[in-house]
Amino acid sequence: MNLSIQGELQLFAEELHQHLTPSFLENLARELTFVKRKRKFSGHDLAIICVWVSQRVASDSLVRLCSQLHAVTGTLMSPEGLNKRFNKKAVCFLKHIFSTLLKNKICETSLIPSSSITYFQRIRILDATIFQVPKHLANVYPGSGGCAQTAGIKIQLEYDLHSGQFLNFQVEPGKNNDKTFGTECLATLRPGDLCIRDLGYYSLDDLDQMDQRGVYYISRLKLNNMVYIKNEFPEYFRNGIVKKQSQYIKVDLEHIMNTLKPGQVHEITEAYIGKDKKLFTRVIIYRLTEKQLRERKKKQVYTESKKGITYSEKSKRLAGMNIYVTNTPLEWVPMEQIHDFYSLRWQIEIIFKTWKSLFQIHDWQNIKRERLECHIYGKLIAIFLCSSTMFKMRQLILQKKKRELSEYKAIGMIQDHLYILYQAIQQNTQEITRILIRLFHLLQKNGRKSHRYEKKTVFDILGVVYEYTGLIKQKKIA
């Protein structure tokens, strides 16, 4: 085994071990008064049942959960006794563990080298996933409305594509507005960051704030927003003052769309957006391909029937294009690459897909609130551990083998090893390192990302140098 890989994984093992040992969990349980005196059900037992062993805390029967706990620890509980342990203090305990792991910034050392990092220190991707919860929780977690969405939980996540670090995170009611959380995330911005936002987070004020702070953005523009260019020959009053309504000329976006061929791009380099307060920006218009347009129309039909929304005729006509706004310099990200860069946002959808398809975070029976929340935070701890491990392995496999790791495949394989990782944590960091080395060998053999014909991967877009089918691939930003 390469000593540098072993050394890297040893440091990573120490980070994992620090906040998950039985002694740490027991001390935390007493500190948070989840456990007041020595009793048969400990904080460590709660972590076992919610994080390490059971994948179905919210859907398996209490009898089954008791059986799983007894099989691993020998702790004998009645179903009624276990149900009582799913209380507010148990939720607080698991939530505290998750928050501690987030603050620990385990992924800060998992940075991948790329040409994009020359320009953008962090590529911040923000999105949310939502799922329904039992209807009797509608007063605590009101849903987003629409078909059968009386109660729901929304999980907001912003993470850095370069390192995998979770930057901002929030569990909230399904009805909460995405834009509000997007504005809250401004507090953690640093000069040199690149924020990629979808329409749900669109805010002209937020984009203006980013620009003022030396932060770059790529965002979709809502179709009801106006785009202007400066009028070179404005009208004046007799006293020499410019008539405000003549300072700018409205751009006919539909006309531009109709002049473009499918897949073609057009840029307005010196544009202004906003009706009253105008923001100077680049505007890029991308005409959708026939396939993309069919998919969008299909989605519109689904949205109209599912959420009771009716699109105007103008919106349906303009559905044939994407309009992007960005303050990135033209020489860093040419207009031909804006659509590719914006597509990086879909990486967060892969993460959310693992949450539901692999971890079943959205799977529940008609249970009480505290048990559901224990399920959610237990899953989030497991998800964070698997994601952090995946991003570390992604970095090492690129660094040592020049290969691109599939995030989805890797998280599934790491999840399969979660229980033996738990067993290693009960011992020492050397044992954790041994398991991580096993995982490294497995992932480099079976975890390579599949490439579709003429489809760029994340590494291609970011300008990462890696090997694929015997060739070295390198895509540069400019």
Curated annotation (Swiss-Prot):
**What processes does the entry annotate via GO biological process terms?**
DNA transposition
UniProt cross-references to Pfam families, sorted A to Z: DDE_Tnp_1 (PF01609)
Molecular function as annotated in GO = DNA binding; transposase activity
Keyword DNA-binding: yes or no? yes
Please give the superkingdom of this protein's source: Bacteria
* Keywords carried by this UniProt record: DNA recombination, DNA-binding, Transposable element, Transposition
Q: Which organism is it from?
A: Bacillus thuringiensis subsp. finitimus
What is the protein named? Answer: Transposase for insertion sequence element IS231E
What is this protein's function per UniProt? Involved in the transposition of the insertion sequence.
Q: Which family does it belong to?
A: Belongs to the transposase 11 family.
